Swiss-Prot record:
Keyword Transmembrane helix found: yes
The protein, known as: Transmembrane protein 236
Transmembrane segments: 7-27, 49-69, 88-108, 121-141, 264-284, 301-321
Chain segments annotated as coiled-coil in the UniProt record: none
Main localization (coarse): membrane
Primary gene name: TMEM236
Keyword Transmembrane helix carried by entry: yes
Homology family: Belongs to the TMEM236 family.
Glycosylated position list: N193
Biased composition (Polar residues): 177-210
């Protein structure tokens, strides 16, 4: 009987291969259907030629790239351990699947324009299934790669408290509290007093003031609250993987708006959406990921969304534009401007 580890490995590999191959076949079938409209309806030669070429492409990249890389990563573990900061499987999916699919999506629109002779007679909306399938496949491969290190049975508690990291202000204590809680200072008060510098009474009063500790979290130790407060890191992988790409998903959906895909705005939307997807090739704990998220997604999306709103109106949410602006400005301010002298003074007050 096959072990659970072997079954997990086989299922994961089949799902990844399906996510690698199916989007290309679906997008090229859509392109073949659009191209067939330029030919005689009784002649299906070009349709089946495009379909056969797409099948040949998938088979070729599978045999020459996908399978050899997978075998090397599985058999030669020392090579896999030498790869730092990026994920080969996601790189193959982005380059060999996502890039051709987005290219064929643009080609479908151009073919439909050439058929009708004008962009005004194009369909009201582009089909949502092909592009959504491309993004869904990429996100699923990302989730599978993250799930590999976890067992699928048993409980795995989350090590993070709601992704809310404690700030340094929440752990600062006053000088008098530290002296009171220190056993060495309690054992030798004379030595402590001899090394301290005398301070004015006003300064001592200010130092004894409590610092902002943040709101207290509720205790859910019994009853239905305990059941509702359960958290598993594997379930959170699905949640945060989709939330991480919600901005790119919304941007790609904008491309289906008639005012976008009937104009030249389709190109920058797809190009910068693909650039933002390059972040998925990096490991989740890569120290450069925060910088790359701003440089590859939020900063370019500021200009794309601003241009769309100015040229075509609010076809993209203003909230998305505000999010990109605030994320970019906060990253620059807290990581770089706070190192300048005028912004580097430590603020003790919570208000």
């Amino acid at each position: 009987m096959a072990s659970g580890r072997l079954i997990k490995f086989v299922v994961f590999e089949l799902l990844e291969f399906a996510a690698f191959s199916i989007p290309t076949l679906v997008i090229t079938e859509q392109f073949a259907t659009a191209y067939q409209g330029t030919r005689a309806r009784s002649d299906n030669t070009h349709y089946w030629l495009i379909i056969s070429c797409s099948i040949a492409y998938v088979a070729l990249v599978t045999l020459l790239i996908w399978v050899p890389v997978k075998v090397i990563l599985h058999k030669k573990r020392y090579i896999y351990r030498k790869i730092k900061g990026w994920r080969p499987v996601l790189m193959m999916c982005v380059v060999l699947t996502t890039l051709p699919c987005l290219t064929f999506s643009i080609a479908v629109t151009e073919v439909q324009k050439s058929i009708n002779g004008s962009a005004d007679v194009l369909p009201d909306m582009l089909p949502d299934l092909p592009v959504s399938l491309v993004l869904l496949s990429l996100i699923m491969v990302d989730i599978i790669e993250k799930l590999r290190i976890y067992p699928l049975r048993g409980s795995q508690k989350s090590s993070e408290n709601g992704h809310i990291h404690s700030t340094s202000l929440q752990h600062i204590k006053t000088v008098t509290e530290q002296v009171r809680q220190s056993p060495e200072n309690a054992a030798s008060p004379q030595a402590t007093n001899s090394t301290q510098v005398s301070q004015p009474s006003g300064a001592m009063t200010r130092s004894q003031e409590s610092v902002f500790m943040g709101p207290q979290e509720p205790s859910c130790d019994s009853g239905i609250l305990r059941m509702m407060s359960r958290r598993d890191v594997r379930a959170e992988l699905f949640l945060w993987s989709f939330l991480l790409w919600s901005d790119t998903i919304e941007m790609v959906r904008v491309a289906g708006h008639p005012n976008v895909y009937k104009s030249s705005w389709l190109y920058p939307v797809y190009i910068f959406s693909f650039i933002s997807l390059l972040r998925i090739t990096f490991t989740p704990q890569n120290p450069l990921l925060n910088s790359l998220s701003v440089l590859l997604q939020d900063l370019p999306f500021v200009f794309v969304r601003l241009g769309l709103i100015i040229a075509l109106g609010t076809i993209t949410p203003v909230l998305g534009l505000c999010k990109n602006i605030l994320v970019t400005l906060s990253y620059i301010y807290f990581n770089y401007l706070t190192r300048i002298r005028i912004f580097s003074a430590f603020e003790m007050s919570p208000f």
